[in-house]
Amino acid sequence: MGDSIRIVKTTSENPDFLSLIKTFDVYLWDRYPELKTNYWGNNIIELNRNVVVIYLDEKPVACGCFKKYDKNTIEIKRMFVAPEARGLGLAQRILQELEQWSLELGYSISILETLYKQQEAISLYQKVGYEIVDNYEPYVGLENSICMRKQIVRIDL
């Protein structure tokens, strides 16, 4: 792979986003089949206008989106980097893009949920300023969930 990176703001109807999400779901359920029953409904993305897809040499390799949680808060959803593109800092780029986009829309707080078994994801989120908090709805009572929160600040991308 070369190093041509293109970041696209799009919607959940984008075919490349949908393809990445299908790959992500297969990855999750292959890795954690025991969790599928409790978590499937929380990962369905309805029409969403706040989606980012990253292309590496014109191939879609990473994605993420956010949705409104409350008047000040967005929830980061469906963060995924394809295995062949990991280690290139793309997950951080997605988070930065989503956070800055949410600031432009007037939000100041970002929350997210990940599985406690996703230690690499937890480490990434902590590295970029997220802190573990009590589980928020709809994750209250789900022992496998780790919820995190961050005050968003403007950065120059």
Predicted regions and their residues:
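Conserved acidic functional residues
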Residues: 69, 99, 113-115
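Conserved GNAT acetyl-CoA-binding A-motif
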Residues: 95, 102-113
